[in-house]
Swiss-Prot record:
Signal peptide: none annotated. Keywords: ATP-binding, Chaperone, Nucleotide-binding. GO terms for molecular function: ATP binding; ATP hydrolysis activity; ATP-dependent protein folding chaperone; unfolded protein binding. This is Chaperone protein HscA homolog. The lineage of its organism: Bacteria, Pseudomonadati, Pseudomonadota, Betaproteobacteria, Burkholderiales. InterPro entries: ATPase_NBD, Heat_shock_70_CS, HscA_NBD, HSP70_C_sf, HSP70_peptide-bd_sf, Hsp_70_fam, ISC_FeS_clus_asmbl_HscA. The keyword ATP-binding applies. It comes from Cupriavidus taiwanensis (strain DSM 17343 / BCRC 17206 / CCUG 44338 / CIP 107171 / LMG 19424 / R1) (Ralstonia taiwanensis (strain LMG 19424)).
Length: 621
């Protein structure tokens, strides 16, 4: 006789059965997968004990693919079909790809995202990333002995909506359920903060293969709050390799190189950089296709000299993030280093000098992000023990707003707001009988729409015709935990609604974000004057238009002289509104407003008499 197992809906019939979830660090150079086993997070290795999976995919003519070390081993021989650092291309168009002239790939400028021509056909960064994620999923299932319920995948804090969506798409293509996208610095904070029960202000300095992130965190009991973020999505260890490659070419006086020679020297450059983490000098040897021999000695002094500008380039966003957080370097309790590139002695020295303390390095910088992601995945899968609930508060990098009359920007969600977040604001119509409203979604810190980045446009139609100012349109901005923005506009009387989900076809580079912030600081005074001028002009237009309508409907309440006086005031407002003096416009508007007070009172009396006509006193009681 078989026994039927009965359990609560949605619950496992085995009360102690764990739901298997993993954390994945989808890196530019290397990727990792980690899981919590026996309450301890650990990185899962392959059958040969290797934790790191090179983020390299090679496509073959038979349409199969090699992933990881096998692909990396063939990179020199088959550079065009061996894709490295694909993370740099996620959500990017062809014009956004940095150092494209040094790349051996045949790019295809496809709509929305660049693609790469390979022996197995044209491949998108989403498809290539999916190969890496599928390999990590298989490794995890082999190690854990069961299927996964999902994964937490980490992304740089500065990934925009298009890049985050591309990451989600890659995961789904790899057969992974995305429990959450988690910012890499936040993942590091989970690993360090909980292991060490840390509280206070911390900085997470994350220099990976292709991206740099700096986050200022406030760690208190149960709450991880990101006070500010910054960084550069086109700066990482690869750039140090690239600079060293240029030095090799210069020192060896090499002629234009083939793609295979270029890849060979890049491999040698990366090996030399890594060797200097343990030694004061190293030798670079290579034999090119032409038979030419490269033999150079690289010292740590030379390496520091030729890469000093890259080190300094990382410190500019650090200063900016500290200013945004309202703290000084001396207030930072500790500095967490993340990413394999932070093993470079020049980086550790520069960070230590800047903050006046030795950075924390007790966790492997290559693994710390994956470990934190695994802890978060374990929590989301429902495996946490009592007291293991954490609140993760990430932030958005730039303010989100909407264009209003006069080309102004009304900020709905200010930058550095914690996410997920939803904010709403009510707007109204400008003209009588207006039945539609254009919604222009903007990103940036400037006061004028023309100076901000346009994210999306849509229209709300079907607004009931009313007098200007009577309709109420509620505009709601919602940013989810993955940083994706949705905007909804709803007319409150009729319930008509329109919405848009913002997935920009091209990503926003971090130097663009830095430039936008710098412009907002530099142009703050000018912007405020421009805003004041635009606001006064809008008010002038509104009052003149309202007065003109009143004259058309109730002009008989005025004598000829009174009407002439009002029209003269209107003409003065129109003329002054074309000028640049917002105070003069305000004064003219006030004169028109005061000059029509008596007219407004007479119109009110007429309206009241009209409303009461034929009514009995008892009806009014």
């Amino acid at each position: 006789m078989a026994l039927l197992q009965i359990s609560e809906p949605g619950m496992s019939p085995a009360p102690h059965q764990r739901r298997l979830a993993v954390g994945i660090d989808l890196g530019t150079t290397n990727s990792l997968v980690a899981a919590v086993r026996s309450s301890i997070p650990e990185v899962l290795a392959d059958e040969r004990g290797r934790a790191l999976l090179p983020s390299v995919v090679r496509y073959l003519p038979d349409r199969t693919a090699q992933i990881g070390y096998r692909a990396q081993d063939e990179a020199v021989r088959d550079p065009k079909n061996t894709i490295v650092s694909v993370k740099r291309f996620m959500g990017r168009g062809l014009r956004d790809v940095a150092n494209i002239e040094h790349s051996p790939y045949d790019f295809v400028d496809a709509p929305g995202m660049v693609q790469i021509k390979t022996a197995a056909g044209v491949k998108s960064p989403v498809e290539i990333s999916a190969e890496i994620l599928a390999t990590l999923r298989q490794r995890a299932e082999d190690s854990l002995g069961d299927d996964l319920v999902g994964a937490v995948i980490t992304v740089p804090a500065y990934f925009d909506e298009a890049q985050r969506q591309a990451t989600k798409d890659a995961a789904r293509l790899a057969g992974l359920e995305v429990l959450r996208l988690l910012n890499e610095p936040t993942a590091a904070a989970i690993a360090y903060g909980l292991d060490n029960a840390a509280e206070g202000i911390y900085a997470v300095y994350d220099l990976g293969g292709g991206t740099f992130d700096i986050s200022v965190l406030k760690l208190t009991q149960g709450v991880f709050e990101v006070l500010a973020t910054g960084g550069d999505s086109a700066l990482g260890g690869d750039d140090f390799d690239q600079r060293l490659l240029c030095w090799i070419v210069e020192q060896a006086n090499l002629q234009p190189l083939s793609a295979q020679d270029m890849r060979l020297l890049m491999v040698r450059a990366r090996a030399a950089k890594e060797a200097l983490s343990e030694a004061d000098s190293t030798v670079i040897d290579a034999v090119l296709e032409s038979g030419e021999i490269v033999h150079l000695t690289l010292t740590d002094e030379i390496f520091e000299q030729i890469t000093a500008h890259l080190v300094q380039k990382t410190l500019a966003p650090v200063r900016k993030a500290l200013r945004d957080a309202g703290v000084g370097p001396e207030e930072v309790k500790g500095v967490v280093l993340v990413g394999g590139a932070t093993r470079m002695p020049s980086i550790r020295k520069a960070v230590g000098d800047f903050f006046g303390q030795n950075p924390l390095t007790n966790l492997d910088p290559d693994r710390v992000v994956a470990l934190g992601a695994a802890m978060q995945a374990n929590l989301l899968a429902g495996n946490h023990a009592p007291g293991e609930d954490w609140l993760l508060l990430d932030v958005i990098p730039l303010s989100l707003g909407v264009e209003t009359m006069g080309g102004l920007v009304e900020k709905i969600i200010p930058r550095n707001s914690t996410i997920p977040v939803a904010r709403a604001q009510e707007f109204t119509t400008f003209k009588d009988g207006q039945t539609a409203m254009a919604i222009h979604v903007l990103q940036g810190e400037r006061e004028l729409a023309s100076d901000c980045r346009s994210l999306a446009r849509f229209e709300l139609r079907g607004i009931p015709p009313m007098v200007a100012g009577a309709a109420r349109i509620r505009v709601t901005y919602q940013v989810d935990a993955d940083g994706l923005l949705s905007v909804t506009a709803r007319e409150t009387h009729s319930g008509v609604e329109a919405s848009v989900t913002v997935k920009p076809s091209y990503g926003l580079a971090d130097d663009d974000i830095a430039r936008m912030l710098q412009d907002s600081f530099r142009e703050a005074e000018h912007d405020m004057k421009s805003r004041a001028l635009a606001e006064e002009r809008v008010e002038a237009d509104r009052l003149v238009e309202a007065t003109q309508r009143a004259l058309e409907t109730d002009g008989d309440l005025l004598s000829a002289d009174e009407r002439a006086a009002v029209e003269a005031l209107m003409a003065t407002v129109r003329e002054i509104a074309t000028g640049e003096d917002h105070l003069a416009i305000r004064a003219a508007v006030e004169k028109l407003s005061h000059g029509t007070d008596e007219f407004a009172a007479r119109r009110m009396d007429r309206s009241i008499k009209s409303a009461l006509a034929g009514r009995k006193v008892q009806e009014l009681g």
